[in-house]
């Protein structure tokens, strides 16, 4: 009887916890500055996965220091 209550408790807990990824979420890259690819270029880094299991890539922001003044 305890095992039956334990199984029902686990099933009810699993039904109340929301799934980790919702089907209503937007799986596309958010703007024109992002691109879905299988591999990011050297000047890009991965943001998230797209709907077709490719990677959403974004350009890296590289700040170049100006000339150092003594």
UniProtKB/Swiss-Prot annotation:
Alphabetical list of InterPro entries matching this protein? Beta_defensin_dom (IPR025933)
Keywords of this protein's UniProt record, alphabetized? Antibiotic, Antimicrobial, Defensin, Disulfide bond, Secreted, Signal
Tell me where on the tree of life, at the top rank, the source sits.
Eukaryota
What start and end residues bound the annotated signal peptide?
A: 1-22
The record's disulfide annotation reads 29-56, 36-50, 40-57
Q: Name one GO biological process term.
A: innate immune response
Pfam families per the UniProt record, alphabetical: Defensin_beta_2
Kindly list the places in or outside the cell where this protein is found, as annotated in its UniProt entry: Secreted
Cellular component terms per the entry's GO annotation: extracellular space
What function does this protein fulfil? Has antibacterial activity.
Similarity comment: Belongs to the beta-defensin family.
Q: What is this protein called?
A: Beta-defensin 131B
């Amino acid at each position: 009887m305890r095992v039956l209550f334990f199984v029902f408790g686990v099933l009810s807990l699993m039904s109340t916890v929301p799934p980790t990824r919702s089907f209503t979420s937007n799986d596309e890259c958010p703007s024109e500055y992002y691109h879905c690819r299988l591999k990011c270029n050297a000047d890009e880094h991965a943001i998230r996965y797209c709907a077709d299991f490719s990677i959403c890539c974004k350009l890296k922001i590289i700040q170049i220091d100006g000339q150092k003044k003594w």
